[in-house]
Amino acid sequence: MLENIFHLKENHTDVKTEIMAGITTFMTMAYILAVNPNILSASGMDSEAVLIATALASFVGTALMALLANYPFALAPGMGLNAYFSYTVVLTMGYSWQLALMAVFVEGIIFIVLSLTNVREGIFNAIPMTLKSAVSVGIGLFVAFVGLQNAKLIVNSDSTLVTYQHFKGETFSSVGVGAILALIGVVITAVLLVKKVKGGILYGILITWVLGILCEIAGIYVPNPDAGMYSVIPTAFVSFDFSALGKTFGQVFKTDFSGVGILNFFAVMFSFLFVDLFDTLGTLIGVASKADMLDEDGKLPHIKGALMADSIATCAGAVLGTSTTTTFVESASGVTEGGRTGLTSMTTGILFLLATIFSPLFLTIPSFATAPALIIVGFYMMGSAVKIDFNDPSEGIPAFLTVLAMPTAYSISEGIAIGVISWTLINLVTGKAKEKKISPLMYVLTVLFILKYVFL
């Protein structure tokens, strides 16, 4: 039955590989179950309700990706978009979280329409192959940087923005030990991959977690919640109380629009739409490139199904009570493990569903255990750099700017924007536009990106 649904042989994979890949993707994404409630609760939402909504929205979106597109991509409420939801729309602009959910819901409806009319697919296909390769590399650096941050190997610095962790001081027994365990995890994962151990990334996560548990038992690792370092020893395994979901479920339809200008609402909604659109396209480009899923013209077969899954998941997430649900770049970890079909994403989706019951267990997976997986995935995604013609400055410079912008601006969509603007303008000014037959959509995107920087 699985063969008939997911076409495993056609995609040169098997059930074991797909399931291992799905588990790996989930393990690298599980942090969203802890982080999303923490961020959205700042807007006044109930954190327990958001946790359940996060798990259910992730299940719905990822299962739809498996069934509609047969791709190994997983979805969950997006980082960055959740921060914009709480800290900008609610806390800074002063809108209610119900109104913010309505903006997310409307954005999802618009995306469904755009997906049905091939607009999103057209944008994907209009982006030149050079930029698609650059997006893959940029996402690799972005993911690795996130991994370094999660491991506390890179921390904030007043003088240089960021700096490496200093392995001394009062927080050494928590932050310092966690960072060291993350480094050990990178080495362990690398050795497993060099030895071609199936599931090496997943085993790396589990081994690092076990080392953390042993260190905590021995008193070497000391939890410090003030520093974001929590106990890694599970104190409970299951929870069957889902009543909290009622505090957010359906609240989107109880939005009070009194005192809210229509232009202000659409400005908020457009911001969600813009970031979600290009984060999703960027992730699809990057992960699909890594998995060699793009055809010779740089197009992604069945992309309409993937975009539809993303759109419906956003609407479902808003109804359940969470910010924009989008395709996760951590899907690359499962692809690196050999995931090639929807069985990978279905496995991930089922684990998110189970997380509503086993949330106490999953929430104890420390960030220093999943960080090595993200760092290693970053390495694998660098392979697309060989597809970029750096000997041609009209191709190489926009590609370089795309790669540079993603980790430094901490945004996939900003990297795409910089890449599209620079690629179009450089080729237009140098007279290469006709030679390269630039798609009219690229001109439209360039204008839209410039307007975005001017007015938003």
What do the predicted segments below correspond to?
Residues 2-36, 57, 78-87, 91-139, ...:
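Helix-loop-helix junctions within the multi-pass membrane cores of secondary transporters/permeases
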Residues 23-30, 63, 67, 144, ...:
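Hydrophobic/aromatic residues within the transmembrane alpha-helices of Major Facilitator Superfamily
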Residues 44-63:
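Loop-to-helix transition at the N-terminal end of transmembrane alpha-helices
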Residues 58-79, 110:
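Juxtamembrane transmembrane-helix boundary signature
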Residues 93-210, 346-456:
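Membrane-embedded alpha-helical modules
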Residues 12, 16, 184, 266-270, ...:
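Alpha-helical membrane-protein architecture signal
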Residues 1-49, 165-168, 205, 209-303, ...:
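Helix-loop-helix hairpins and the membrane-proximal interhelical loops
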Residues 19, 39, 123, 199, ...:
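Residue-level signature of catalytic and energy-coupling elements of molecular machines
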